[in-house]
């Protein structure tokens, strides 16, 4: 049967039949006659513009009744093997049970059912037996078709059973339109028994619990939601929270599902999507075509490939596609009239024309509306929006009852594309969503989206190119695009261009993805307020239009300019989400980000708006994400860096505005570095591409988009174009990208390293050096950069160090060599200026050089207690303070010796103390000084660790203590007017030691004499003993292993000799 014929017929038949069928399908599923309800619904549904039943019947040359044994089908309402049978049974049974004439009402459903029940083993979802092959043949469209064909079966099933019967009429029409095309195109798709079982398992639940729900899409979601409106809302909110995750998940789940159901399709789709970027374009074309095919799978319009991806993705996706496409067909039609109207109304009332009519006429729009709608309507607000739009548009179409029922549906099903699709797609996906929702979202985004969406070969290359999350967002974004008329127009226009230009297409969807994420965030927020949701939808649409146009241009340019492989995956949605979550989370960066956002119209809208939105719902972990996503967005690398150093930069925020990073590090510099970034992106893309050609191409395109966006944003003010590599953690040639660099001072940023900004400078080595230093140097560099006010270049370098090459990435050529040179200079400069800094800090952080022992001890303790890292710079500060103290003591004692006529004994003591101090300073202090320098120099091969420094410092403390004791003694003598005998402490000490001995009288005099004579010497000896003991202990510890080895070496030869 011609698609043209079958689709209208199917649409008509479904539109007319499904309402009736829906009326009774619920009966079959729930045992409750839905006839009245269905009838009511059907009546409004019938009121929806749609092909006449006669046409449907006529066009359904393959009347479901022909293929479907009504009794057979109805007897197997729960026959899970023929999911169609099971689901369709309820539907058909419902139809029949409802008393709907099987030929008219249930024929098509029966046909579906018939395929489902008769062909349960093959589980043909579509009326035509040949559809399975077609479904597979048309993997991209097939996916749509299969979805649609699934939709007819499942559509009928869901429509009659789970889906809200009331909603099915209009949906039926739209769905019919979609389904007709879907049926015709998709013909019959064989759904694996397991998939059918899943469908049955899900759908019956949906039927049971959610039979009133109008959306097939919600059927799976409904299945989840059917339990209670509260749970549904919870799921909806979870889905909203997870929508980004869901995108990532969906990419992965779809990939898995694709592997399951349509692994062949996956291949086909990979090929189709890879070879069919034209088909991706056709996805765009399908947006028009799909106005029928994708119309039925409106939700899938831009993602017909997604549909195919989703379809090939699998049982779960097949479920989702069945369910989705059923929702797509019916619910889509439903949602086109209902969801779309609602959604379109919610997102853009302009788009909301008559979704029922648009569902037929504007199937792509319906798609868009639906996606955008679901985006808008994803939550209870979706209900709200649905109520609004549905009430506005669907009032004639839907009875208030239906609308309330739909409200209970929550339109979780509305986002069935993504969310509904996930729930519908299978709980498998929901679980991943939950997993992503669980908090590994960043990783899920990075790994799942990049790994699963991008990396998983199951996802079609198109999916890879347009990551499933992207695809989903794209799918939804076209819908989201249609969410807002402007974006719909932009999507219609830009997607057409994109369809013409796959790169642009991907870029646009990427943009769409980001916008979709944004829209989702908006829709989430919108869920917070349907009104704001609608305004946001409009804003989103406009924003997306602008962004789409800008980014499509920029991305296409970036694609060309960057010469990036295939698709740089813009995880723009997740990336923006993360980044903007980062900004929003890091309000410090937000000003900069805001400026970047402001500067970047696109990003400013996305980032600013998204930041605003995302501030509330950012699924991305707060700073962690912001740091890693850091450079990529409008954030300047400084921002990323700032994210990394947000705390310190919070203080330095004003001193370190993005542009104030120094003339060196202007966003314009980063623009120049954009060239470097382009090179880096190209290199990274090439590397990633080499690492994962497909994923890397996808990422490349996405990143090309990001790169172009970043360039634009950089121009706007994004200094750092770090294209977030987080998507491709495994593909990241430099596992620790600039983001890490930016964050290397932050340990948590290390965790964030998944998010790699493809910075101008991609430097693992540098990062390592930076990171190593940044830990110790970060504080110093931060303080130094701020406090020392070293040349912006040096500061830049340090910050580059600290912040990773983020600064340098843009301010400096991305060449690692340069960075290394800078780092080297930095290291030297750091140390030197650190010395200066130490001098400054010495007074602040360390006790003023007090010539006496207690201050010295305090200083030591201060060093230990100091919150500062005990790294080379810290120890240098301590050393500097100690040196100054000793020098002070020496000068004081020398002055005293000159000014006062002192006894030779006292002068000897002074000379001894001063000589000891000078010797200590000239030798051990100098050694320690160089050790600290080496510690601060990441390039130092025998680079001592902080522990080494601490150990050496402890050793020095023995000597310092010894010297300090000498000066303390001199100080006591000075207090005693340089009279040794007169020192009361000595007398007391003389007396005090005697009690210690058990024989005080005997020991008294000798001890007294000894102390009076040898007190200074004894103190020195004691100090020496302690020092020697400490040295011995240290040397023993250090050499214990060696000593053991020596002993072994010694004894082994002996043993050998003996042997």
Swiss-Prot record:
Region (Disordered): 31-54, 245-311, 613-669, 723-756, 985-1025
Tissue: Expressed in various brain areas.
A Gene Ontology biological process term: signaling
Topology within the bilayer: Peripheral membrane protein
GO cellular-component term (any): glutamatergic synapse
Alphabetical list of InterPro entries matching this protein: SAPAP
Ranges in coiled-coil conformation: none
Modified residues (Phosphoserine): 302, 308, 390, 456, 667, 670, 673, 720, 745, 776, 811, 983, 1012
Keywords from the named record: Cell membrane, Membrane, Phosphoprotein, Synapse
Biased composition annotated in UniProt, kind: Basic residues: 272-285
Positions with biased composition (Basic and acidic residues): 262-271, 747-756, 1007-1025
Assembly and binders: Interacts with DLG4/PSD-95.
Role noted for this protein: May play a role in the molecular organization of synapses and neuronal cell signaling. Could be an adapter protein linking ion channel to the subsynaptic cytoskeleton. May induce enrichment of PSD-95/SAP90 at the plasma membrane.
Family, per entry: Belongs to the SAPAP family.
Official protein name in the record: Disks large-associated protein 2
Organism: Mus musculus (Mouse)
């Amino acid at each position: 049967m011609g698609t043209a014929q079958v689709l209208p017929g199917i649409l008509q038949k479904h539109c007319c039949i499904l309402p009736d069928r829906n009326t009774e399908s619920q009966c079959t599923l729930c045992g409750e006659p839905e006839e009245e309800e269905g009838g009511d619904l059907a009546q409004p549904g019938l009121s929806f513009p749609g092909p006449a039943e006669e046409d449907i019947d006529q066009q359904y040359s393959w009347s479901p009744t022909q293929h479907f044994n009504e009794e057979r089908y109805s007897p197997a309402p729960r026959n899970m093997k023929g999911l169609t049978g099971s689901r369709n049974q309820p539907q058909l049974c419902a139809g029949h049970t409802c008393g709907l004439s099987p030929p008219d009402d249930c024929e098509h459903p029966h046909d579906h059912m018939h395929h489902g029940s008769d062909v349960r083993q093959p589980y043909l979802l579509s009326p035509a037996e040949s559809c399975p092959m077609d479904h597979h043949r048309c993997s991209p469209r097939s996916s749509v078709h299969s979805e649609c064909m699934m939709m007819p079966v499942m559509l009928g099933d869901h429509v009659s059973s789970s889906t809200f019967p009331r909603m099915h009429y209009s949906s039926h029409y739209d769905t019919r339109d979609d389904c007709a095309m879907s049926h015709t195109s998709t013909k019959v798709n064989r759904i694996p028994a397991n998939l059918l079982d899943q469908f049955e398992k899900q759908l019956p639940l949906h039927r049971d619990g959610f039979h009133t729900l109008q959306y097939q899409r919600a059927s799976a979601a409904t299945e989840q939601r059917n339990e209670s409106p509260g749970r549904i809302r919870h799921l909806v909110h979870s889905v909203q929270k997870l929508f980004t995750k869901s995108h990532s998940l969906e990419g992965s789940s779809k990939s898995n599902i694709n592997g399951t159901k349509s692994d062949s399709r996956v291949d086909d789709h990979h090929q189709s999507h890879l070879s069919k970027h034209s088909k991706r374009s056709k996805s765009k074309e399908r947006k028009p075509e799909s106005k029928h095919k994708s119309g039925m799978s409106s939700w899938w319009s831009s993602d017909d490939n997604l549909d195919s991806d989703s379809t090939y993705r699998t049982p779960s996706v097949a479920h989702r596609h069945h369910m989705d496409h059923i929702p797509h067909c019916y619910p889509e039609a439903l949602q086109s009239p209902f969801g779309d109207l609602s959604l379109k109304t919610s997102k853009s009332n302009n788009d909301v024309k008559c979704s029922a009519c648009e569902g037929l006429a504007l199937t792509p729009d319906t798609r868009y509306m639906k996606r955008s709608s679901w985006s808008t309507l994803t939550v209870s607000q979706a209900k709200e929006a649905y109520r609004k739009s549905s009430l506005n548009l669907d009032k004639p179409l839907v009875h208030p009852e239906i609308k309330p029922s739909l409200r209970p549906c929550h339109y979780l099903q509305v986002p069935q594309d993504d969310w509904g699709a996930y729930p519908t797609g299978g709980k498998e996906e929901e679980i991943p969503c939950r997993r992503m929702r669980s908090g590994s979202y960043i990783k899920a985004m990075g790994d799942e989206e990049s790994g699963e969406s991008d990396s998983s070969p199951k996802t079609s290359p198109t999916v890879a190119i347009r990551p499933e999350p992207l695809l989903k967002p794209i799918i939804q974004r076209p819908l989201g695009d249609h969410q807002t008329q402007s974006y719909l127009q932009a999507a219609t226009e830009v997607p057409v261009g994109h369809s013409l230009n796959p790169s642009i297409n991907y870029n646009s969807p990427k943009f769409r993805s980001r916008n979709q994420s944004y829209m989702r965030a908006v829709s989430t927020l919108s869920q917070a307020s349907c009104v704001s949701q609608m305004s946001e939808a409009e804003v989103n649409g406009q924003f997306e239009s602008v962004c789409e146009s800008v980014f499509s241009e920029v991305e296409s340019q970036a694609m060309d300019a960057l010469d990036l492989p295939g698709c740089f995956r813009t995880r723009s949605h997740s990336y923006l989400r993360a980044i903007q979550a980062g900004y929003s989370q890091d309000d410090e960066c937000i000003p900069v980000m805001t400026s970047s956002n402001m500067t970047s119209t696109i990003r400013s809208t996305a980032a600013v708006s998204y930041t605003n939105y995302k501030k509330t719902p950012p699924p991305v972990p707060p700073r962690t994400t912001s740091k890693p996503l850091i450079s990529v967005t409008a954030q300047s690398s400084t921002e990323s860096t700032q994210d990394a150093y947000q705390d310190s930069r919070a203080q330095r925020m004003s001193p370190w505005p993005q542009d104030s990073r120094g003339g060196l590090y202007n966003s314009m510099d980063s623009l120049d570095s954009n060239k470097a970034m382009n090179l880096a992106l190209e290199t990274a893309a090439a590397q990633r591409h080499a690492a994962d050609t497909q994923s890397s191409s996808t990422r490349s395109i996405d990143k090309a988009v990001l790169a172009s966006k970043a360039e634009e944003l950089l121009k706007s003010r994004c200094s750092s174009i770090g294209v977030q590599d987080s998507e491709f953690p495994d593909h990241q040639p430099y596992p620790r990208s600039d983001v890490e660099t930016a964050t290397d001072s932050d340990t948590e940023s290390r965790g964030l390293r998944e998010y790699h900004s493809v910075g101008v400078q991609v430097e693992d080595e540098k990062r390592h050096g930076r990171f190593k230093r940044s830990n110790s140097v970060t504080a110093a560099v931060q303080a130094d950069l701020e406090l020392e006010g070293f040349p912006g270049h040096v500061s830049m370098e340090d910050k580059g160090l600290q912040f990773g090459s983020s600064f340098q990435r843009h301010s400096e050529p991305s060449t690692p060599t340069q960075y290394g040179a800078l780092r080297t200079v930095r290291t030297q400069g750091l140390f030197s200026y650190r010395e200066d800094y130490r001098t400054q800090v010495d007074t602040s952080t360390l006790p003023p050089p007090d010539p006496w022992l207690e201050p010295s001890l305090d200083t030591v303790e201060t060093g230990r207690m100091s919150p500062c890292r005990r790294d080379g710079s810290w120890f240098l500060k301590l050393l500097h303070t100690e040196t100054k103290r000793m020098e002070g003591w020496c000068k004081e004692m020398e002055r005293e010796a000159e000014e006062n006529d002192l006894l030779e004994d006292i002068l000897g003591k002074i000379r001894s103390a001063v000589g000891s101090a000078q010797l200590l300073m000239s030798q051990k202090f100098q050694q320690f000084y160089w050790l600290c320098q080496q510690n601060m120099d990441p390039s130092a091969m025998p680079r001592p660790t902080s522990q080494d420094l601490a150990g050496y410092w402890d050793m020095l403390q023995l000597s310092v203590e010894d010297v300090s004791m000498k000066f303390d003694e001199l100080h006591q003598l000075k207090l005693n007017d340089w009279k040794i005998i007169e020192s009361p402490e000595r007398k007391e000490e003389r007396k005090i030691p005697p009690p210690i001995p058990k024989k005080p009288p005997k020991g008294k005099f000798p001890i007294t004499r000894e102390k009076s004579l040898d007190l200074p010497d004894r103190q020195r000896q004691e100090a020496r003993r302690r020092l020697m003991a400490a040295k011995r202990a240290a040397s023993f510890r250090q050499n214990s292993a060696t000593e053991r080895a020596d002993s072994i070496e010694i004894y082994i030869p002996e043993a050998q000799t003996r042997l």
